[in-house]
Amino acid sequence: MIKLGIVMDPIANINIKKDSSFAMLLEAQRRGYELHYMEMADLYLINGEARARTRTLSVEQNYDKWYEFTGEQDLPLADLDVILMRKDPPFDTEFIYATYILERAEEKGTLIVNKPQSLRDCNEKLFTAWFSDLTPETLVTRNKAQLKAFWEKHSDIILKPLDGMGGASIFRVKEGDPNLGVIAETLTEHGTRYCMAQNYLPAIKDGDKRVLVVDGEPVPYCLARIPQGGETRGNLAAGGRGEPRPLTESDWKIARQIGPTLKEKGLIFVGLDIIGDRLTEINVTSPTCIREIEAEFPVSITGMLMDAIEARLQQQ
């Protein structure tokens, strides 16, 4: 029997209608896996050994009672076959410390989804630089004068921090906007932090598409997140409306071009953000949108994921 651990935010507070981690647990349970639940505070290192307090649990699609803890133990993480790292951003130093603990278990043979080193290496905004032929024009800088020159060249740009999620602190600066200076100062904290500028993509009106990639294989359907009421952000957390759709030809092309790199880096479950035919982000920490897509189309994304995990475990 496969022992699957999950590190996540408190399960008591999730919305099971749209929580991807919960969907993964349901599928793992359906396959007869033993489920071990952990929060960040449960992980620890003792003399170089990664351990955790884990709680075995059962889950069910029930809005009143969706989980039950069935036992508690303290064990070496190496006792688990696979661990899903599903802690939501912020990607801060605490998150990084947790990846080091998980890496100690990985060295003992536990499969970590996603690979701890790659979680550290692949910033969700900056990792797109390795695929610059697929992205909008992109500038990463702390320098206000460079941001101003980029804005003057494109006259309509998006500015964002490198560590935001859910659309937080994303600004659109149009031609003639008097606020560029203060936005640049705010995002760079007066030239002490990097931020990202990209040319505005009018295709955002048709949605910011979340394309999921499972061990290098694109899921054939995506979730387009469509901005509402004059917003420029499609993020569901910013009030965007989700619309599941089949992938377009350009979606396939982008996902297939990036897929082999993701697989090679041990990034087994990844969410690409695509606007029109341009790649804007590569989400590796805790991608979501499984439930919205599965509700609309005949696809089991969690099934694809567990198949990929089982295939990797057999190769070990």
Swiss-Prot record:
One function term, GO molecular function aspect: metal ion binding
Reaction it catalyzes: gamma-L-glutamyl-L-cysteine + glycine + ATP = glutathione + ADP + phosphate + H(+)
Membrane-spanning residues: none
Cofactor annotation: Mg(2+); Mn(2+)
One Pfam family per UniProt: GSH-S_ATP
Residues involved in Mg(2+) binding: 281, 283
Pathway(s) served: Sulfur metabolism; glutathione biosynthesis; glutathione from L-cysteine and L-glutamate: step 2/2
Keywords, ordered alphabetically: ATP-binding, Glutathione biosynthesis, Glycoprotein, Ligase, Magnesium, Manganese, Metal-binding, Nucleotide-binding
GO cellular component labels: cytoplasm
Entry's EC annotation: 6.3.2.3
Domain ATP-grasp: 125-310
Cofactor: binding comment: Binds 1 magnesium or manganese ion per subunit.
Glycosylation sites recorded in the entry for this protein: 256
Xref: NCBIfam families: glut_syn (TIGR01380), PRK05246.1 (NF003573)
Record-stated family: Belongs to the prokaryotic GSH synthase family.
Official protein name in the record: Glutathione synthetase
Organism (species): Escherichia coli O127:H6 (strain E2348/69 / EPEC)
